[in-house]
Amino acid sequence: MKKFFALLLALVMSLSLVACGGGDDATTDDTTDDATNEETGGETTNDYKISVVLKTLSSEYWGYVKAGCDAAAAELGVEVSVVGPGAESDIEGQVAQIEQQIGAGCDAIICAPNDAGAAANALQAALDHGIPVLSVDTDVGIEGQTTFVGTSNVDAAYEGGKWAIGQAGDGAKAVIIYGQEGDNTSNMRREGYQKACDEAGVKVLATLSGQNTTDGATKTMEDMLSAHPGEIDIVLCHNDDTAIGAMNACKNAGVSDVIIVGFDGNASAVDLILAGDLIKATVAQQPYEMGYQAVEAAVEVLNGGTVESVINAPVEVVTAENGQAYLDNLASMQG
């Protein structure tokens, strides 16, 4: 593969020299591009192609990330291609998409990996050929990547867990429904929830995977309710789809005295919170902003600039008290 790219690069360079009439003209073209970028205050005038490979496009949360990417592309005048497999569990499908995007040609690639190790192996081809690699939401952690745009999942889950424990009071018992096995984000959120419980002396009755889906979480919650009847006070969930699955299981079992906490800040979850349903809070990331900032960072680097190695995205615990304000702000960002 490396030999193929080397031959292709040599061919392109030789054709460019013929078209430009020699090395002096080629140098002039490079200078003109730099000058144009300076005249526009850092905004690109090049036809940059930026590929974005998300965990999936089949969820509300990742739709927000895509919307942020698209908004940045429109504002900065670049072409962005956003893809993702049908489910977050489809690791091989995502790897294939990464390889397809690199093979099709891109100036930078942004990835939210379903499996960091598998994604890193595929993204190495981009780094080997000088293509900037950026992570969004979940850190690929590959040596040489440009930046990670995202949330400290440990700290964010810790805040969500602390809020739930404060609402439940002394003697509460909890369960944790985490996401995909082996996923870095899932591991970090589970760690944050566990930390909050440990510090408060809250017993964690069970920690099981909900497979990042509503149906998977429903089945997991049913198993937890069967194993610990009448004992569960708090359900700490990997994301809002998981929280909705847990809520469905509780309703089916006639359980109403439970505090369910989601994660992501999806509008569908906030609507349930405001309606007084079993989901009482969601740890809201800023997915739209993360998508926007990732594309913005890619353009900055392509224009010859530099960015921080980590671009932190803020979080807040959304409850019935601040839910409507959160929804209003979310709507305003999406136009």
Name each region found by the language model.
Residues 2-23:
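Sec-dependent N-terminal signal peptides of Gram-positive bacterial secreted proteins and lipoproteins
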Residues 17-335:
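A residue-level marker of the well-folded mature domains of exported/periplasmic proteins
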